Amino acid sequence: MISLITATYGRTEEVRTLLGSLARQSYKDFEFILVDQNPHFILREMVAEYASRLTIQYIRSEAKGLSLNRNIGLDYSRGEIVAFPDDDCFYEEDVLEKVIDVFQRQKDIVLVATAVKDAFDGRVWKVSERELISRNKTLRYCFSNNIFVRKTEARFDVRLGVGAYWGSGEESDYLWEI
């Protein structure tokens, strides 16, 4: 199973787009964990609309901070593989199927990074399947919305990321911990 963990604040239509892309996935053995930092449970009804099509855990969090809330999602996750789609991204229909195929064929890998296409300007950041991602390449190829990792005890440093003292760097730090 794959656990997809999204921490969100201040976005509604973007989350709807993400949910729609998840409902269209060809691979179905995944759960979506939405950690909602918004006031007044504004996403609860939207999540309910998708509950019959997706395995969703909706978690309301009073605490603010991307890394902190991703860690909350990790605490609830049941998958052997975890990923952290941003609340403003979406996946092509076969992404999860391709990712799980790589993990099943290559039992010793801990990380799969997919290609990323910028929806605004069409730029693509692509990783070759044969290319190994070393520590030095995580900054070049690994973004929060394109990394899938075998679940470990690793957690995000709550001092890093949106809403924290240091506003970025949480993905690289997390991957280096793995």
Place the predicted regions along the sequence by residue.
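Conserved donor NDP-sugar-binding/catalytic core segment of glycosyltransferases
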Residues: 94-125
